[in-house]
């Protein structure tokens, strides 16, 4: 391809509303153009990268035995009402009515539609297992779309759905997709981690997220460098930091702590380590009889993990209590709360570490006062115990193989064991060998195709622009002839190299725009093409051209006769 036959539209400066690196560089490189909030046109450069991502995904899905289909973007509300997600999903599900006042949804995922296909088409165990996938447009009406395509409203996603006869089959399908995802991300050329995760709104019994590692990632990835343990922050298990509880050594004392409402300020005022304080977090669970009030206790230097809290029996769909509810239950404003002496019945749950603490400090349920020397069993009943906190770097790994470290990542893929979450609610069944009706066991597997672009850039860039991994670069090689429109020798040699690389199956573009060298180099470094060949009169007089990899600090002189072979060897590496 020649640049004069393509469309290149780069910018020297990023738009003012571009916040993160990938958004800025994609706009400057002319990959995307904003059409509306969270909605973008994918320009030719950007679309080439998307197609390369899609091709790798499609090849590996087919290799794994999945079957491609295409489901509608607009889906009837009745299917979503069957599973309850029509009401549960809230405003992020874009709803619309047709001219007959019938309700529809713009798909954010396709569990309902694919389950409808399965229940209509699959009758017998002989038709199982099967794995359907599509690469399709999705839409989520984000409250605050930002960060370019990283948190846009419209996006392209590969979603796959497996159907099996039993849990053993589901496990095999899940492992098959997990392995396919590992191959996909390796082929992308990205540093990534697969981590244990929470199932979230989709539901099910087990899941893993695939994260591209990047310092700018919005997700915390917890891992043990000396073992295979890895999880996202929501799912990472926090072991108790105290092996056992020490015997009480202090008396319970109600101590004045004037205007000290935060654990940090209380610890400083009392001259004790922050680790001896206990933080009180009040939650409410709405019931037909009214709001149940729960008090969760974590150590003063720790943070509540809301996903873990939601898994405490009886606390699903909790909310944070209002200040009025807090004062009504405890007789004290926030900042001075604790498990001793609440005005009304409160359910108390202690984090594992708090359950092993002795002589700790907590609120006294009285403004400007805290209790010191608090001990379980003596001063208050033994608590219900649960893992409630976020892990921190240096915690013991749950597998006993070392300590945990934390890095940042960008979620680009997710695999779920759904089980019968959708097949039972939608009556997707089959007949087994004995003629008995059984619900299908489902798995769900997603990859954010367009999100891959942003994540790859966040991991691979420098001050000059994008540095694409070779497998998903818009072009593998760019030829930059200096004086293409003025020198017959330069034109002839550039055309020859271009033709030979094309004949060898190399994805190459020849910049025949007649731009100055500085403009050409700046454009292609910004766009991020991995390999560059520069042809100029000065080098040709010595029988040389210049080769430079996008990550190389200096160009290398290569003989005209060897340049095609040299480029091909670099591509092979």
Swiss-Prot record:
Belongs to the class-II aminoacyl-tRNA synthetase family. ProS type 1 subfamily. It holds the Pfam family HGTP_anticodon. Consists of three domains: the N-terminal catalytic domain, the editing domain and the C-terminal anticodon-binding domain. Homodimer. SUPFAM superfamilies: Class II aaRS ABD-related (SSF52954), Class II aaRS and biotin synthetases (SSF55681), YbaK/ProRS associated domain (SSF55826). One of its GO terms (molecular function) is aminoacyl-tRNA deacylase activity. Keywords: Aminoacyl-tRNA synthetase, ATP-binding, Cytoplasm, Ligase, Nucleotide-binding, Protein biosynthesis. InterPro entries: aa-tRNA-synt_IIb (IPR002314), aa-tRNA-synth_II (IPR006195), aa-tRNA-synth_II/BPL/LPL (IPR045864), Anticodon-bd (IPR004154), Anticodon-bd_dom_sf (IPR036621), Pro-tRNA-ligase_IIa (IPR002316), Pro-tRNA-synth_IIa_bac-type (IPR004500), Pro-tRNA-Synthase_IIa_type1 (IPR023717). PROSITE patterns: AA_TRNA_LIGASE_II. Its EC number is 6.1.1.15. The keyword Cytoplasm applies. It catalyses: tRNA(Pro) + L-proline + ATP = L-prolyl-tRNA(Pro) + AMP + diphosphate. One of its GO terms (cellular component) is cytosol. CDD domains: ProRS-INS, ProRS_anticodon_short, ProRS_core_prok. PANTHER family: MITOCHONDRIAL RIBOSOME PROTEIN L39/PROLYL-TRNA LIGASE FAMILY MEMBER, PROLINE--TRNA LIGASE. NCBIfam families: PRK09194.1, proS_fam_II. This is Proline--tRNA ligase. It comes from Cupriavidus necator (strain ATCC 17699 / DSM 428 / KCTC 22496 / NCIMB 10442 / H16 / Stanier 337). It is found in: Cytoplasm. It is an enzyme of class 6 (ligase). Catalyzes the attachment of proline to tRNA(Pro) in a two-step reaction: proline is first activated by ATP to form Pro-AMP and then transferred to the acceptor end of tRNA(Pro). As ProRS can inadvertently accommodate and process non-cognate amino acids such as alanine and cysteine, to avoid such errors it has two additional distinct editing activities against alanine. One activity is designated as 'pretransfer' editing and involves the tRNA(Pro)-independent hydrolysis of activated Ala-AMP. GO terms for biological process: prolyl-tRNA aminoacylation. The keyword Transmembrane does not apply.
């Amino acid at each position: 391809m020649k640049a004069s036959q393509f469309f290149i539209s780069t910018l020297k400066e990023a738009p003012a509303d571009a916040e993160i690196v990938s958004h800025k560089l994609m706009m400057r490189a002319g990959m995307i153009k904003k059409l509306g909030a969270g909605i973008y046109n994918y320009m030719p450069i950007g679309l080439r990268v998307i197609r390369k991502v899609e091709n790798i995904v499609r090849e590996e899905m087919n290799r794994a035995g999945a079957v491609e289909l295409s489901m509608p973007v607009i889906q009837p509300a009745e299917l979503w009402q069957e599973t309850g997600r029509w009401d549960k999903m809230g405003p992020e599900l874009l709803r619309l009515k047709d001219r007959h006042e019938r309700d529809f949804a713009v798909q954010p995922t396709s569990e309902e539609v694919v389950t409808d296909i399965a229940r209509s088409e699959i009758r017998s165990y002989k038709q199982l297992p099967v794995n359907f996938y599509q690469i399709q447009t999705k839409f989520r009406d984000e409250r605050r779309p930002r960060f370019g395509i990283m948190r846009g409203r419209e996006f392209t996603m590969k979603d796959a759905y497996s159907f099996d006869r039993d849990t053993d089959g589901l496990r095999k399908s899940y492992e098959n997709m997990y392995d396919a995802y590992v191959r996909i991300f390796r082929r992308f050329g990205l540093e990534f981690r697969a981590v244990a995760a929470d199932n979230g709104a989709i539901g099910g019994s087990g899941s893993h997220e695939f994260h591209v590692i990047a310092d700018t990632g919005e997700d915390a990835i917890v891992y043990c460098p000396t073992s295979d343990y890895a999880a996202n922050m929501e799912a990472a298990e926090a072991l108790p930091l105290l092996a056992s509880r020490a015997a009480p050594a202090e008396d319970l004392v109600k101590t004045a702590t004037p205007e000290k409402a935060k654990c940090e300020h209380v610890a400083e005022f009392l001259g004790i380590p922050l680790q001896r304080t206990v933080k009180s977090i009040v939650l409410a669970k709405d019931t037909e009889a009214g709001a149940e009030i729960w008090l969760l206790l974590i150590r003063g230097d720790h943070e509540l993990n809301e996903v873990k809290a939601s898994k405490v029996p009886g606390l699903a769909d909790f909310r944070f209590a209002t200040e009025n509810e807090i004062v009504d239950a405890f007789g004290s404003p926030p900042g001075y709360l604790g498990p001793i002496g609440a005005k009304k019945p409160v359910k108390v749950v202690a984090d594992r570490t708090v359950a092993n603490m002795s002589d700790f400090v907590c609120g006294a349920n009285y403004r400007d006062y805290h209790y010191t020397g608090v001990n379980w069993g003596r001063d208050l009943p033994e608590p219900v115990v649960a893992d409630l906190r976020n892990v921190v770097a240096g915690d013991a790994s749950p597998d006993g193989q070392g300590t945990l470290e934390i890095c940042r990542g960008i979620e680009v893929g997710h695999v779920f064991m759904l089980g019968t979450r959708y097949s039972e609610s939608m009556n997707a069944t089959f007949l087994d060998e004995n003629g008995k009706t059984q619900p299908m066991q489902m798995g769900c597997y997603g990859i954010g195709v367009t999100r891959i672009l942003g994540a790859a850039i966040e991991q691979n860039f420098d001050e000059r622009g994008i540095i694409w991994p070779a497998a998903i670069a818009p072009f593998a090689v760019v030829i930059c002839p200096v004086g293409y429109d003025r020198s017959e020798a330069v034109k002839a040699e550039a055309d020859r190299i271009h033709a030979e690389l094309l004949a060898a199956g190399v994805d190459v573009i020849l910049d025949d725009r007649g731009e100055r060298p500085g403009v050409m180099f700046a454009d292609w470094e910004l766009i991020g093409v991995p390999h560059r060949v520069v042809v100029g009169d000065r080098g040709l007089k010595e029988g040389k051209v210049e080769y430079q990899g996008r990550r190389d600090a200096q160009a290398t002189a290569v003989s005209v006769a060897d340049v095609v072979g040299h480029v091909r060897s670099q591509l092979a590496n």
